[in-house]
C-alpha cells in the first residue's frame, strides 16, 4: 500500500472529510484530491502538513 493510500484509508476509517483535512493542512482542495487519487506526488512537506492536521506522526503512514 502506498503512502497516499494509507493516508486516505486513515481519513476514511476515522470518518473525516478530505476537504476538512485539506483546509486544516493548508493544501488546496484540488491538490489534496489529486494526491489522494494518486495523480500527484505526495511530497514530504505535504505529508508533514497532513499529519499535523490529523495530529499523527508521519511514521504512521511510512
Language-model features: where?
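Helix-turn-helix DNA-binding elements, focusing on the entry/boundary residues of the two helices
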Residues: 18, 29, 44-47
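Key DNA-contact positions within bacterial/archaeal DNA-binding proteins
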Residues: 19, 30-33, 59
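A short, Lys/Arg-rich alpha-helix, primarily the initiator
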Residues: 1-17
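Short alpha-helical "recognition helix" segments of helix-turn-helix
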Residues: 21-22, 50
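Short, basic-rich loop-to-helix N-cap that marks the start of a DNA-contacting helix
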Residues: 39-52
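Recognition helix of helix-turn-helix/homeodomain-like DNA-binding domains
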Residues: 27-42
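Short C-terminal boundary/hinge segments that cap the last helix of small helical domains
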Residues: 55-62
Amino acid at each position: 500500500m502506498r503512502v497516499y493510500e494509507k493516508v486516505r484509508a486513515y481519513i476514511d476509517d476515522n470518518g473525516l472529510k478530505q476537504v476538512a483535512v485539506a483546509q486544516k493542512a493548508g493544501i488546496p482542495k484540488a491538490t489534496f484530491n489529486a494526491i489522494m487519487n494518486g495523480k500527484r506526488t505526495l511530497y514530504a512537506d505535504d505529508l508533514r502538513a497532513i499529519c499535523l492536521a490529523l495530529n499523527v506522526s508521519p511514521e504512521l503512514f511510512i
